[in-house]
């Protein structure tokens, strides 16, 4: 009995402080001299995870990322001496984490409970799974620096996990592991610098609040294709861009976020559910494994390229802030491998509300609507981590992080502080309209208030691949704007008294709205629209508009006037074909057949107008 150690952590004694006061998720601790800002601490006997957010004398204010019920004054507070960090390595893809990167699946298997117990301490990445490691052309004696690629792990059939030297490391290679199976904490590389030997495992730990370094930021030049016609044609985003989707409840923010995750041309998806309903995350978990993407003729589940950070509305409020940073750090890690990453944050409003709650508990001076004065700066520091970059190290590679942030303003009010601060930062604004959603027009994107500042950046891409597209888009915007101006006149005097050309504008605008902008994301033919189909549909609709106007204007002075009624009666079949272009299924029919069908319809159009004028 006497040889049993009474204290496991005698050497940790000096690292303990004491709880002084508790106020919800905010805990004040004393005897904390020597702590650093944003240091990770463990609070109470349950060892709850917390982060120091303020220091005064030897008092520290701690933001706790778990439920603090049961913490009493005098409980120990253990300092860890390191910032809140995430583990980066093989095993991230296909996983689901909470806001502080605890693996929810593993916790569920260990506890057999649907709840996360307090203070649970499970490693984020499995220490028992082994991965097949293949060294790249790095030999013993070669010099490497931070960001260099030294190995390859086939994480799954969609993602090749490239092993990156820690950005802060450098030196001469003393040992590189031969090809074989290794666990994430096995040493696969040893470097020597200034006589100091460093051992590297497949696992990297990185502080979440610190952006990962890059060689340089590059201008974006490639579109982020979403598969939603209204977004790809009128308000395109780029790979490495920032986008906000504000909208009231029930407008379809989550459906757009999920459609982006399913069908966008990204290599890796990080989906952060921040303070939203748990059902939405479970829907993602249920749907994604069933959905597949075809790469090189092989169909794969898209869950293999997705990682989820779930921080639902019933989880502690403070962890929402951490979940956003966890998500962006995971995104930057995959960007450094040379991938195009998309991060969905659903929703940044809940994150801002968490900031507001913590700020209120700290008795800080409130600004607009009770949000803290630094709300704009916090949002900017998050969105500025997006971008297309030249990655650190060799071989040379480019990667990008695109951020799509959903914003839920109360009552759909776009003058809300979070929405207005976000719109000052992001470059693309997809505004959702309650009236469109009530009319069951989905995606309910208001084409009059939305905008994209990336149009000019993408002109080269369009000129090279789809030269006719830019004038078509300009024409569509003109027609929709004209229709909006005419709609007031129509309500006053009716359609009959309009000029013939205005009647054509109204009808084509109706065709555009119902059969081009509207899209059923729950149908097999329309849940995803490739860009060639979008351009083909636009071309036929706009050519119909131009020819109809030309026919009416050229015969206006002659005896055989062509009016809109004449066109409509003569071209019933053509108009039906125009409105049913969206039913072409890109998976079943294939690109060549759809293009041929659209070309045939275009010829029929021209022939029909020739017959009409003769």
UniProtKB/Swiss-Prot annotation:
CDD domains: ATP-synt_V_A-type_alpha_C, ATP-synt_V_A-type_alpha_N, V_A-ATPase_A. It comes from the Eukaryota. The modification Phosphoserine is found at residue 142. InterPro entries: ATP-synt_VA_C, ATP-synth_a_Xtn, ATP_synth_asu-like_sf, ATPase_a/bsu_AS, ATPase_F1/V1/A1_a/bsu_N, ATPase_F1/V1/A1_a/bsu_N_sf, ATPase_F1/V1/A1_a/bsu_nucl-bd, ATPase_F1/V1_b/a_C. The keyword ATP-binding applies. One of its GO terms (molecular function) is proton-transporting ATPase activity, rotational mechanism. Disulfide bonds: none annotated. Its EC number is 7.1.2.2. ATP binds at residues 247-254. GO terms for cellular component: plasma membrane; plasma membrane proton-transporting V-type ATPase complex; vacuolar proton-transporting V-type ATPase, V1 domain. The keyword Translocase applies. Keywords: ATP-binding, Hydrogen ion transport, Ion transport, Nucleotide-binding, Phosphoprotein, Translocase, Transport. Catalytic subunit of the V1 complex of vacuolar(H+)-ATPase (V-ATPase), a multisubunit enzyme composed of a peripheral complex (V1) that hydrolyzes ATP and a membrane integral complex (V0) that translocates protons. V-ATPase is responsible for acidifying and maintaining the pH of intracellular compartments and in some cell types, is targeted to the plasma membrane, where it is responsible for acidifying the extracellular environment. This is V-type proton ATPase catalytic subunit A isoform 2. It comes from Drosophila melanogaster. The gene is Vha68-2.
């Amino acid at each position: 009995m006497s040889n049993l150690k009474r204290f496991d952590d005698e050497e940790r004694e000096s690292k303990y402080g004491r709880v002084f006061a508790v106020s919800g998720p905010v805990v004040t601790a004393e005897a904390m001299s020597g702590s650093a800002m944003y240091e990770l601490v463990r609070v109470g006997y349950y060892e709850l995870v917390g982060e120091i957010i303020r220091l005064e004398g030897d008092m520290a204010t701690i933001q706790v990322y778990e439920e603090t019920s049961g913490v009493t004054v005098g409980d120990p507070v253990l300092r860890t001496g390191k910032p809140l960090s995430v583990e980066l390595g093989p095993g991230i893809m296909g996983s689901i984490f909470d806001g502080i990167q605890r693996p929810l699946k593993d916790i569920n298997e260990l506890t057999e409970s649907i709840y996360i117990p307090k203070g649970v301490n499970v490693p984020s990445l499995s220490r028992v799974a082994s991965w097949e490691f293949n060294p790249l052309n790095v030999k013993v004696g070669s010099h490497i620096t931070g960001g260099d690629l030294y190995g390859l792990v086939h994480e799954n059939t969609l993602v090749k996990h490239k092993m990156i030297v820690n950005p802060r490391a450098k030196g001469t290679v003393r040992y590189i592991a031969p090809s074989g199976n290794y666990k994430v904490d096995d040493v696969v590389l040893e470097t020597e610098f200034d006589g100091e030997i460093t051992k590297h495992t497949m696992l990297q730990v990185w502080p979440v609040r610190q952006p990962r370094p890059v060689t340089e930021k590059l201008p974006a030049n490639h579109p982020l294709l979403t598969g939603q016609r209204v977004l790809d044609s009128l308000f395109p985003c780029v790979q490495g861009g920032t986008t906000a989707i504000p909208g009231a409840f029930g407008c379809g923010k989550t459906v757009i976020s999920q459609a982006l995750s399913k069908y966008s041309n990204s290599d890796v998806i990080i989906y952060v559910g921040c303070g939203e309903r748990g059902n939405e995350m479970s829907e993602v978990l249920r749907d994604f494994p069933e959905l597949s993407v075809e790469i090189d003729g092989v169909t794969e589940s898209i869950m293999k390229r997705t990682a989820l950070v779930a921080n639902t509305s019933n989880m502690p409020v403070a962890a929402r802030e951490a979940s956003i940073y966890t998500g962006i750090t995971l995104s930057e890690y995959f960007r450094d491998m040379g991938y195009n990453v998309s991060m969905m944050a659903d929703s940044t409003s809940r994150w801002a509300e968490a900031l507001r709650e913590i700020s209120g508990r700290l008795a800080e001076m409130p600004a607009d609507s009770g949000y803290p004065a630094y709300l704009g700066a916090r949002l900017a520091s998050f969105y500025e981590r997006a971008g297309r970059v030249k990655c650190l190290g060799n071989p040379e590679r480019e990667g990008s992080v695109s951020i799509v942030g959903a914003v839920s303003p109360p009552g759909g009010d776009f003058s809300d502080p979070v929405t207005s601060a976000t719109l000052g930062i992001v470059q693309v604004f997809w505004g959702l309209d309650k009236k469109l959603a009530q009319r069951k027009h989905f995606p309910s994107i208001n084409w009059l208030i939305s905008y994209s500042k990336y149009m000019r950046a993408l002109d080269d891409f369009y000129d090279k691949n789809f030269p006719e597209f830019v004038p078509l888009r300009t024409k569509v915007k003109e027609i929709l704007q004209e229709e909006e101006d005419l709609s007031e006149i129509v309500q006053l005097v009716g359609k009959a008294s309009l000029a013939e050309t205005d009647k054509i504008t109204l009808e084509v605008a109706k065709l555009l709205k119902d059969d081009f902008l509207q899209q059923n994301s729950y149908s097999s033919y329309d849940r995803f629209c490739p860009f060639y189909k979008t351009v083909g549909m636009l071309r036929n609709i706009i050519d119909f508009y131009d020819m109809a106007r030309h026919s009416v204007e050229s015969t206006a002075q002659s005896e055989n006037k062509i009016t809109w009624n004449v066109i409509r009666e003569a071209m019933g079949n053509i108009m039906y074909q125009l409105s049913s272009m969206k039913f072409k299924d890109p998976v079943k029919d294939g690109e060549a057949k759809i293009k041929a069908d659209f070309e045939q319809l275009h010829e029929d159009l021209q022939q029909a107008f020739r017959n009409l004028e003769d």
